[in-house]
């Protein structure tokens, strides 16, 4: 967002997502934030919930949850049976990504410097036939100079985030895959490699 300047400028509960080290700028004892947004004329929905609390004068703890999903996707696997088309057999499913973050930020001994990190659990679901669970860690640092410049770095998925996919199809559904020359998905492991984001902002 904003050419990555948000990584440096964020200073409230939403820092748990953008840059955990920015949580130390929170002034209130407790902050709560919620957001809902539609994409592609309502085809996809994004939801965010964040809660953060001061642990001490120098540290902050937060919990964040995000959901991004496409709902009511037609499932046409059973549309044609024995050469007959029957739209009553068309069902619907959702493809949804969930992210759960527990974040902590701490001011360093050096004035203006802070560090933060997030442990995250990622869950993805596509109907009743595909799901995955994964785990990852984000780390960040932020430095605010005396002339109001802020420099920040965010290391996403620094440990390499994994998602273990599990597929569950009935024998009838697998037969449809074979008849239509489609490959039957196999259980697999998806990896997200580390990504470093730099941001600069000025008040």
Functional labels for PLM-detected ranges:
Residues 1-203:
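Subset of outer-membrane beta-barrel
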